[in-house]
């Protein structure tokens, strides 16, 4: 196994049995923390095998070119979504990850209520792909400009290593502490960023307001990660799941169904949202579900 570079110590790491309270404390302090062994190796291997055909068939480059959002995505980068329909491991194991929800609940519940997926996607970087510019993910929301210091974050990201993340193959770079910067600080320079080396199954938990960007892949093999982008149910997701066949959705747990928008949510004030008329979506639709197997 490849040895992790020494600069990885700039981003703190926690073991799989670390309490949610300790994880959240580090997240609030630095904006990013590595969760070691977030997924076991069997889960990583199953997911890798299930997504391979979709990755192979997908054309590299940006999926869209929005005005005012400057995020460099080259032809050697593939961002592949629709994972609920593609991967059984994703919809049954990853969306139900207990450690993940034990962290997300206290981050979202007191301030917003329920949360769901903004988007789940595989980030695949081919050899020769240059480094991505440093950016913040929460620029999606105009309301981020209204946030005050200490306000809860609107987006929580979990980037899971499907392959190794190393300096030479495009390990994501972060600027710890930059989540509390205001706009007067400007864009950080590359020398302010620390790379985050990961082994398959490790994950990076980071807030949407943190400056970060994928590194350059100077190796002879691709680098692959799974990005789970999560936000309150108040916000419209980037990725809709209404097209996912009902037979697939009904094979999922209630929690996983809510994560993809097939169930109604509740705000922090116990106000129901995403209703079907005056009733919960799942009740009106007669939606079935399965418990964790």
Swiss-Prot record:
Use of this protein: Compounds in the chrodrimanin family such as chrodrimanin A or verruculide A exhibit strong inhibitory activities against protein tyrosine phosphatase 1B (PTP1B) and therefore, they could potentially be developed into drugs for the treatment of type 2 diabetes or obesity. Furthermore, chrodrimanin B, the end product of the pathway involving chrodrimanin A or verruculide A, does not exhibit the PTP1B inhibitory activity, while it functions as a potent blocker of insect GABA-gated chloride channels.
Keyword terms: Dioxygenase, Iron, Metal-binding, Oxidoreductase
Enzyme's top EC category: oxidoreductase
Keyword Plastid: no
Keyword Oxidoreductase: yes
InterPro entries: Phytyl_CoA_dOase-like
Pfam families noted in UniProt: PhyH
Disulfide bonds: none
EC number: 1.14.11.-
Pathway in which this enzyme or protein is active: Secondary metabolite biosynthesis; terpenoid biosynthesis
Superkingdom, taxonomy of origin: Eukaryota
Amino-acid positions noted as binding Fe cation in the UniProt annotation, renumbered to this chain: 135, 137, 212
Catalytic activity: chrodrimanin C + 2-oxoglutarate + O2 = verruculide A + succinate + CO2 + H2O; chrodrimanin H + 2-oxoglutarate + O2 = chrodrimanin E + succinate + CO2 + H2O
One of the protein's GO biological processes: terpenoid biosynthetic process
Gene Ontology MF terms in the entry: dioxygenase activity; metal ion binding
Cofactors, names only: Fe cation
SUPFAM superfamilies, per the entry: Clavaminate synthase-like
General function of this protein: Dioxygenase; part of the gene cluster that mediates the biosynthesis of chrodrimanin B, a meroterpenoid that acts as a potent blocker of insect GABA-gated chloride channels. The first step of the pathway is the biosynthesis of 6-hydroxymellein by the polyketide synthase cdmE. The prenyltransferase cdmH acts as a 6-hydroxymellein 5-farnesyltransferase and produces the hydrophobic metabolite verruculide C. The FAD-dependent monooxygenase cdmI further converts verruculide C into verruculide B.
Oligomeric and partner information: Homodimer.
Protein family (similarity comment): Belongs to the PhyH family.
Protein name: Dioxygenase cdmA
Organism of provenance: Talaromyces verruculosus (Penicillium verruculosum)
């Amino acid at each position: 196994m490849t040895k992790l570079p020494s600069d990885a110590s700039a981003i703190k790491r926690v073991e799989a049995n670390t309490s949610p309270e300790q994880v959240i404390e580090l997240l609030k302090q630095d904006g990013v923390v590595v969760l070691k062994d977030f997924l076991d190796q069997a889960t990583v291997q199953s997911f890798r095998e299930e997504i391979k055909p979709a990755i192979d068939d997908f054309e590299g480059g940006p999926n869209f070119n929005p005005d005012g959002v400057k995020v460099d995505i080259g032809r050697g980068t593939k961002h592949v979504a629709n994972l609920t329909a593609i991967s059984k491991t994703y919809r049954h194991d990853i969306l139900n990850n207990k450690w993940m929800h034990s962290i997300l609940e206290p981050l979202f519940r007191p301030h917003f209520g329920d949360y769901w997926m903004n988007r789940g996607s595989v980030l695949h970087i081919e050899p020769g792909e240059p480094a991505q510019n440093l950016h913040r993910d929460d620029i999606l929301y105009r309301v981020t400009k209204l946030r005050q210091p200490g306000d809860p974050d609107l987006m929580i990201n979990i980037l899971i290593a499907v392959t190794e993340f190393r300096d030479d193959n495009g390990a994501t770079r972060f600027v710890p502490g930059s989540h509390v910067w205001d706009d007067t600080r400007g864009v950080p320079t590359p020398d302010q960023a620390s790379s985050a080396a990961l082994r398959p199954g490790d994950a990076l938990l980071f807030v949407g307001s943190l400056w970060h960007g994928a590194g350059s892949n100077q190796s002879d093999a691709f680098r692959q990660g799974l990005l789970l982008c999560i936000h309150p149910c108040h916000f419209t997701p980037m990725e809709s799941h209404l097209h996912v066949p009902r037979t697939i959705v009904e094979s999922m747990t209630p929690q996983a169904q809510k994560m993809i928008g097939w169930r109604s949510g509740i705000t922090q004030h116990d106000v129901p949202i995403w209703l079907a008329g005056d009733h919960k979506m799942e009740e009106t639709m007669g939606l079935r579900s399965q418990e964790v197997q």
